From Swiss-Prot:
Official protein name in the record: Mannosyl-oligosaccharide 1,2-alpha-mannosidase IA
EC assignment: 3.2.1.113
UniProt family annotation: Belongs to the glycosyl hydrolase 47 family.
Membrane topology category: Single-pass type II membrane protein
Pathway info: Protein modification; protein glycosylation
Length: 469
């Protein structure tokens, strides 16, 4: 259904045209490969997916469906039926393959009802199970999906697994059990929760590193940005997805949020609320673009907040949204840097060259989407449209959309990658901001951390959870 307001309709149509440009460019120059290099007009394959192909196709499926791009959806489905192959002798990122491939296939199944997507999702889920063969049951980050041999990132603290990686399997794995009738997926993720619950949390905070062999924390670094972010998101969403029956997830979420408020949330002298990083008790006054998702998270969770705190969390979400908007507004390109700082007189600005890039990330418009849905304050549509205009001015190229190496510089230095999440997330959230609320209402649908749609689970799924405990 089209929005009633002609101006909103026109903006929504523009965002659909952006999706068409991104998709058609991918199809023309990189079809079947993982991602597109829009400047050199060729395919790009990230090592995150090993030799699995088609990341952009699977990631874009539900966006194509929602935007009514039917012929494109059908050609994507045909490619998946004929060419999506998980029998590869290669090492993949369990987290990335879960959120993009499993999430994308589940979402496409729930939206379209096409059996091929369910079948492929479950087939891939089974391939990921050997990652859990560790002494603690905390999965490896990397898995060879043919041999079943896993390991962790060599840079991660003392061989640790990463909180945001093993903590961002829960929603998809609950759905895999629901759709396959096999409780093993739910058991694996409920065990992760059990391990986390038994551990002592420093100041109530969850460190980013956990050793899968000893089941103990690695370095005491805490972040709501990269390495931590989606763990917290999935606690809240696990509770919402269970029709609010998963009270353990709810308690873990609100306890964590309380510790975050006490130890990490600060206000700059210029009045901007930000979320710092915690390193063994010392704060680093830096906020990542990835952390900007938290505005939407706080607002989405406001409804279930402890007595009298709902308004507080909506306001906190609005403050984070404002800070992240400032990080965009204070650049030349009007797109935000990868990380921005609040120290030495700087506020919401990247001070290091290696933090000045923008890779088409969605977290800021994701927060605008939740804030729009939950408050209908027109500024969120205004800010979203600013982002659309900046993307069109600076990231759109003849061969698709490219990330930028420096958002403060007066002309574009392209990174030559059209990220699959630009189609999965950034364009989807923008489209939803200019759609009516009855397109994917929040009371029926949960977005995974790659913006893939998962319905609230019917009550029969609770049986699986109970048996696990």
């Amino acid at each position: 259904r089209e929005p009633a307001d002609a101006a909103v309709r026109e903006k929504r149509a523009k965002i659909k045209e952006m999706m068409e440009h991104a998709w058609n460019s991918y199809k023309r120059y990189a079809w079947g490969l993982n991602e597109l290099k829009p400047i050199t007009k060729e395919g790009h394959s990230s090592s995150l997916f090993g030799t699995i192909k088609g990341a952009t196709i699977v990631d874009a499926l539900d966006t194509l469906f929602i935007m009514g791009m039917e012929s494109e959806f059908q050609e994507a489905k045909s490619w998946i039926a004929e060419n999506l192959d998980f029998n590869v002798n290669a090492e993949i990122s369990v987290f990335e393959v879960n959120i993009r491939f499993v999430g994308g296939l589940l979402s496409a199944y729930y939206l379209s009802g096409e059996e091929i997507f369910r079948k492929k999702a479950v087939e891939l889920g089974i391939k990921l199970l050997p990652a859990f063969h560790t002494p603690s049951g905390i999965p490896w980050a990397l898995l060879n999906i043919k041999s079943g041999i896993g390991r962790n990132w060599p840079w991660a603290s003392g061989g640790s697994s990463i909180l945001a990686e093993f903590g961002t399997l829960h929603l998809e794995f609950m759905h895999l059990s629901h759709l396959s009738g096999n409780p093993i997926f739910a058991e694996k993720v409920m065990n992760i929760r059990k391990v986390l619950n038994k551990l002592e949390k420093p100041e109530g905070l969850y460190p980013n590193y956990l050793n899968p062999s000893s089941g103990q924390w690695g370095q005491h670094h805490v972040s709501i940005g990269g390495l931590g972010d989606s763990f917290y998101e999935y606690l809240l969403k696990a509770w919402l997805m269970s029709e609010k029956t998963d009270l353990e997830a709810k308690k873990m979420y609100f306890d964590a949020v309380q510790a975050i408020e006490t130890h990490l949330i600060r206000k700059s002298s210029g009045g901007l609320t930000y979320i710092a990083e915690w390193k063994g008790g010392l704060l680093e006054h830096k906020m990542g673009h990835l952390t900007c998702f938290a505005g939407g998270m706080f607002a989405l969770g406001a409804d279930g907040a402890p007595e009298g705190r709902a308004q507080h969390y909506l306001e906190l979400g609005a403050e984070i949204a404002r800070t992240c908007h400032e990080s965009y507004n204070r650049t030349f390109m009007k797109l935000g840097p990868e990380a921005f700082r609040f120290d030495g007189g700087v506020e919401a600005i990247a001070t290091r060259q290696n933090e000045k890039y923008y890779i088409l990330r969605p977290e800021v418009v994701e927060t605008y989407m939740y804030m729009w849905r939950l408050t209908h304050d027109p500024k969120y549509r205004k800010w979203a449209w600013e982002a659309v205009e900046a993307l069109e001015s600076h990231c759109r190229v003849n061969g698709g959309y490219s990330g930028l190496r420096d958002v403060y510089f007066t002309h574009e230095k392209y990174d030559n990658v059209q990220q699959s999440f630009f189609l999965a997330e950034t364009l989807k959230y923008l489209y939803l901001i200019f759609s009516d609320d009855d397109l994917l209402p929040l009371e029926h649908w949960i977005f995974n951390t790659e913006a893939h749609l998962l319905p609230i689970l019917p009550t029969d799924q609770k049986e699986v959870e109970v048996k696990v405990k």
